[in-house]
Amino acid sequence: MTDVTVKTLAAEIQTSVDRLVQQFADAGIPKSADDSVTAQEKQTLLSHLNREHGSAPDKLTLQRKTRSTLNVPGTGGKSKSVQIEVRKTRTFVKRDPQEAERLAAEEQAQREAEEQAQREAEITAKREAELKAEREAAEKAKRDASDKAKRDAAEKDKVSNQQTDEMTKTAQTEKARRENEAAELKRKAEEEARRKLEEDARRVAEEARRMAEENEKNGINPVEQTEDTSDYHVTTSQHARQAEDENDREVEGGRGRTRTASKTARPQKKGNKHAESKADREEARAAGRGGKGGKRKGSPLLQQGFQKPAQAVNRDVVIGETITVGDLANKMAVKGSQVIKAMMKLGAMATINQVIDQETAQLVAEEMGHKVILRRENELEEAVMSDRDTGAAAEPRAPVVTIMGHVDHGKTSLLDYIRSTKVASGEAGGITQHIGAYHVETDNGMITFLDTPGHAAFTSMRARGAQATDIVVLVVAADDGVMPQTIEAIQHAKAAQVPLVVAVNKIDKPEADMDRVKNELSQYGVMPEEWGGEAQFIPVSAKAGTGIDDLLNAILLQAEVLELKAIRNGMASGAVIESFLDKGRGPVATVLVREGTLNKGDIVLCGFEYGRVRAMRNELGQEVLEAGPSIPVEILGLSGVPAAGDEVTVVRDEKKAREVALYRQGKFREVKLARQQKSKLENMFANMTEGEVHEVNVVLKADVQGSVEAISDSLLKLSTDEVKVKIIGSGVGGITETDATLAAASNAILVGFNVRADASARKVIESESLDLRYYSVIYNLIDEVKAAMSGMLSPELKQQIIGLAEVRDVFKSPKFGAIAGCMVTEGNIKRHNPIRVLRDNVVIYEGELESLRRFKDDVNEVRNGMECGIGVKNYNDVRVGDMIEVFEIIEIQRTIA
């Protein structure tokens, strides 16, 4: 430690210099104010002051605080923090020398006393051990004397028993000789029987060995089985059975008791989990009664006797229309995790409580090796449908003819001429957008016509028309030939196995070519009769009326060949051709009766809907009371708008019809939800990028069900990878307040096709500023949705070269580095544009033009044929002969094709 002066020390201990000098003098150390003080001198001064002012403190107390936080769980599952402070106090006591000597003496005396007590305890223990050894020796001598006396008595008993045995042995020898003679004769007789038994036993053993080898080969371990020799109990009472067993043991107690006594007398270990109960011991003892010497052999108690089958058990699994994963696992007697694992292998994700459809459950069950029995849960529906009164007599009926073909080929005009009415002029845009059902009385008989739309959007309508028809009239324009919807109509007719009659329309035009139409149709399997085929080709003109009679005769001739018949009397059945919601009349369905007679007041079941026929009208709007086979009518009175294509059936009971309709609705909902929940692995990556896709939401309302279906399909087909059309809601009828609210909530476009919004809906549309559009032609609707989708597409970026400069020289600049002295050879060079540096026509750098100067002046643009200095940002390896290409990025708006 560095020495300090007296003055400094006085300042440290906060006392005066004179007082400190006086204290040093009293301690025998003469000092002045400027003299230095050593550590030894400080210690001497401190000792002097302690002696003078009294002793130093006897004890020193140290205090320490520690703070921490403890989380204590509280009510409601929440925890609260509690601040904890731990205070520790430690006291150090300075012992007086005399006191220390006194304490040391006390400790020494205590140690000596403990040693003395330990020595006395050892002596006492030694004395007790000697006394115990003496007692044990005396007891051993007493036991030896007693054992010797017992052995002497046993020896005497043994000698007497031997004498008695010798006397009885002589008598028994004579008796045994006589018995041996009789036994010899008996042995010879039994030997033959034993030989036969041994042969039988050898054969049985060989069979058992062979079966054991087969079981071992199949992986089945035989379980040792004990031979149950116990008697059957006469009574079922438990106490009576125990008493009966006790009596049996007393009677047969001599058998094997000596050998089993030691085993049964052993005490069981305390706490043994597998200790046998009393009933188990009784059962085991009873099972071993007849054994030799009391020995019994058997499988240990508590051993699992179930063995895993060598082969999987195949079960008959009955599956309804929907089933949960857990129920399917129970039916197959496997764990639910195994079913989920099997579904993941098939590419479907599911949980234990998820509802899956019948097809998925069938695939999973068959994959796991079980036989599937599909059950249709429609007993009520079958009972209602079977309880129908249909007449047995079938009568000839009128043919149902569907007119199909490409758009604008003259289908409706042809039918218009046949009916002698102006139907085509009433269609919006001059194209058919519904299925028109008409029956026409001709001189040769009645014909029912179905006029289908030819536009590409109405594929499902044409398919329904082909399914409900007997004959298809394919209209082909002689000047236009085969078109896409013509090919589609041929495919629908072939799928429905319906004969074709080809009407070559517009034959009066100068550019009409009949042979061209025949050649083109022959490529799709429609061969004319004159070429050896089956199709009739009739040249007609819907405008001039040429060939119309020939077409009708061809239709009736084809109908005669088909021999069309139907049951006229009885409960009717048919199909829904079209359906819509009329504001005044409610749900309206156009029904084509196939068989039976539909009467006003009949109870009908139609898909998910039911009701009583309140009124019927024909295609002219006239009220009718009944409709026979092949007659199209409009019916009123259904509970809702049915789907086009649904079966219409007349039933007896309205209550049962309602139950069937509700059952169909619930089942359809279950199946729909089950299919929606199915999440396949291949869709997982599509869902990951779903946020990057723009969506055009549409709420669609139309006048008829077929138009809703056609427009929905057309709009969904417009979807691309970047923009998707989503039909938020659709329906038949006018635009209501509910539709407007739905469009506002989902930010959707309201589209009305041949319908209008009511007053309440218009208020919501105005207040929410919704986009409402009315259409009457499907072309315009699709084009405008395409335009809306095009506006959501991200623009395409294109690079356009605006200038090219050749490096003539390179200069060094302290501010920008290498500066290229260039000559502009093409276009213009603009500042802050992206550039490319080309060397030998190869791009070696792509960056930004940082500096552009001409005659030491910064400029924004240099034109063709002028010199300039170019500084490239973050690039200094510019050489003479390089080309600097300047370009700009322009955006090009994309459109939906």
Curated annotation (Swiss-Prot):
Residues 430-434 are annotated as: G2. Disulfide bonds: none annotated. Keywords: Cytoplasm, GTP-binding, Initiation factor, Nucleotide-binding, Protein biosynthesis. Its main location: cytoplasm. InterPro entries: DNA-bd_dom_put_sf, EF-G-like_DII, EFTu-like_2, IF2_assoc_dom_bac, IF2_II, IF2_N, P-loop_NTPase, Small_GTP-bd. HAMAP family: IF_2_B (MF_00100_B). This is Translation initiation factor IF-2. It comes from Enterobacter cloacae.
